């Protein structure tokens, strides 16, 4: 067996205070886009005990009840009393929202006068997309498992299987890999860590037994578990106080959980609460589609794509591709295929990925359990684009 290494990814579920904020920001975005697809939205949320504040810059024709969106989102997650960390119906809701800066508006969309191909990037920045053939989702296994454990925790809380669960929770998975000429091959799960909020009545033994039976078993394939797999289940011993009561929350603080679990790279820009002129979001979505399409087409087993922008300029400043030595043809040729197959101008990304369409909780769904590797028609950037290349050529 080749030499192996350990790699760890974490996730948090929808009751984590930072994720609560992401979901509120994206629920606001959904509401704006549903009524006015040209809404310009930069919506931040913060929360602490008994308080949620929504603030930012929004220019929209939509009639939006911000307070109702906040309360509905908190309630749907399960924050229905102070005991669980926040009472959706009685907490304070503060709103401080202004219009988009006219300086930004004229530079990016010319106060709504520019054609789609002329729309400039809403800011400077660089974004990365990543894909790997180690899972059917073409996502890193460590990230997929951590994310699915978090989603499963919420599922068994909401369906009553584990009635002692409360909304807040974190997961972390360490996977043993070996490197097969640049491709990542998972061997086994080394460690599983779950810290979940719980009520006063349950014992630590019950927590451990229920988590193994109802959360870990259904999520982690048996082939990855063995007698050496380590389980840390609520290792702190007590997690009754959670949600915004336990920690303050803020939009945009879980950007690695939202993307690739520490694999690939990250340009630093968060996603939630941003309309598609914000390339932090739309740029990251299009390069995920590019990287995924490269791997799905057999051009490479693993791939990262970077794009960069200047504020007000439609064309990207740079596009970069690296296949970690797994490419069937040289990376510079793959880069050429990417440039011919994908339009990186923000206005065209919006059209090609249908990113101006709100409603149906479209962006709210992205705000918990990851933006990538999801099987949902609303996640248009996960659709593989056929790439034309001569696959008889071997590197």
Swiss-Prot record:
Pathway: Amino-acid biosynthesis; S-adenosyl-L-methionine biosynthesis; S-adenosyl-L-methionine from L-methionine: step 1/1. Keywords: ATP-binding, Cobalt, Cytoplasm, Magnesium, Metal-binding, Nucleotide-binding, One-carbon metabolism, Potassium, Transferase. Binds 2 divalent ions per subunit. The metal ions interact primarily with the substrate. Can utilize magnesium, manganese or cobalt (in vitro). Homotetramer. The lineage of its organism: Eukaryota, Viridiplantae, Streptophyta, Embryophyta, Tracheophyta. Coiled coil: none annotated. It catalyses: L-methionine + ATP + H2O = S-adenosyl-L-methionine + phosphate + diphosphate. Catalyzes the formation of S-adenosylmethionine from methionine and ATP. The reaction comprises two steps that are both catalyzed by the same enzyme: formation of S-adenosylmethionine (AdoMet) and triphosphate, and subsequent hydrolysis of the triphosphate. L-methionine binds at residues 57, 100, 247, 278. ATP binds at residues 16, 168-170, 236-239, 247, 253-254, 270, 274, 278. K(+) binds at residue 44. InterPro entries: ADOMET_SYNTHASE_CS, S-AdoMet_synt_C, S-AdoMet_synt_central, S-AdoMet_synt_N, S-AdoMet_synthetase, S-AdoMet_synthetase_sfam. This is S-adenosylmethionine synthase 3. It is found in: Cytoplasm. Belongs to the AdoMet synthase family. Its EC number is 2.5.1.6. It holds the Pfam family S-AdoMet_synt_N. Its cofactor is Mn(2+); Mg(2+); Co(2+); K(+). One of its GO terms (molecular function) is ATP binding. GO terms for cellular component: cytosol. Mg(2+) binds at residue 10. Its main location: cytoplasm. Disulfide bonds: none annotated. GO terms for biological process: one-carbon metabolic process; S-adenosylmethionine biosynthetic process. The gene is METK3. SUPFAM superfamilies: S-adenosylmethionine synthetase (SSF55973). It is an enzyme of class 2 (transferase). It comes from the Eukaryota.
């Amino acid at each position: 067996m080749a030499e192996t290494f350990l790699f760890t990814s974490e996730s948090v579920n929808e009751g984590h205070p930072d994720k609560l904020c992401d979901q509120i920001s994206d629920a606001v975005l959904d509401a704006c886009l549903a009524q006015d697809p040209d809404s310009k939205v930069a919506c931040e949320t913060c929360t602490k005990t008994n308080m949620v504040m929504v603030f930012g810059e929004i220019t929209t024709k939509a009639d939006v009840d911000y307070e109702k969106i906040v309360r509905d989102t908190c309630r749907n997650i399960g924050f229905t009393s102070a005991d669980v960390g926040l009472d959706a119906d009685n907490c304070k809701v503060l709103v401080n929202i202004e219009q988009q800066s006219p300086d930004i508006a004229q530079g990016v969309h010319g106060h709504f006068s520019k054609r789609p191909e002329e729309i400039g990037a809403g800011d400077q920045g660089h974004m990365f997309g990543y894909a790997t053939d180690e899972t059917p989702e073409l996502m890193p296994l460590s990230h997929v498992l951590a994310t699915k454990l978090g989603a499963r925790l919420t599922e068994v809380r909401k369906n009553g299987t584990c009635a002692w669960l409360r909304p807040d929770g974190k997961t972390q998975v360490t996977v043993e890999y070996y490197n097969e000429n640049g491709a990542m091959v998972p061997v086994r799960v080394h460690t599983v860590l779950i810290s979940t909020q719980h009520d006063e009545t349950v014992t630590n033994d019950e927590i451990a037994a229920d988590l193994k039976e109802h959360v870990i078993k259904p999520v982690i394939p048996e082939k990855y578990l063995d007698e050496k797999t380590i389980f840390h289940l609520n290792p702190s011993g007590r997690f009754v106080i959670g949600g915004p009561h336990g920690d303050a929350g803020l939009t945009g603080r879980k950007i690695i959980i939202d993307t690739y679990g520490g694999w690939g790279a990250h340009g630093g820009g968060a996603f939630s609460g941003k309309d598609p002129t914000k390339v932090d979001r739309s740029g990251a979505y299009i390069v995920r589609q590019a990287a995924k399409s490269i791997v799905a087409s057999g051009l490479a087993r693993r791939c990262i794509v970077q794009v960069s922008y200047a504020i007000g300029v439609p064309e990207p400043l740079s596009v970069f591709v690296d296949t970690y030595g797994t490419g069937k043809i040289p990376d510079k040729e793959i880069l050429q295929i990417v440039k011919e197959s994908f339009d990186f101008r923000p206005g065209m990304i919006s059209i090609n990925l249908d990113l101006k369409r709100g409603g149906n909780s479209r962006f709210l769904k992205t705000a918990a359990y990851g933006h990538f590797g999801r099987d949902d028609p609303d996640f248009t950037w996960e659709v593989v684009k056929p790439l034309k290349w001569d696959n008889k050529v071997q590197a």
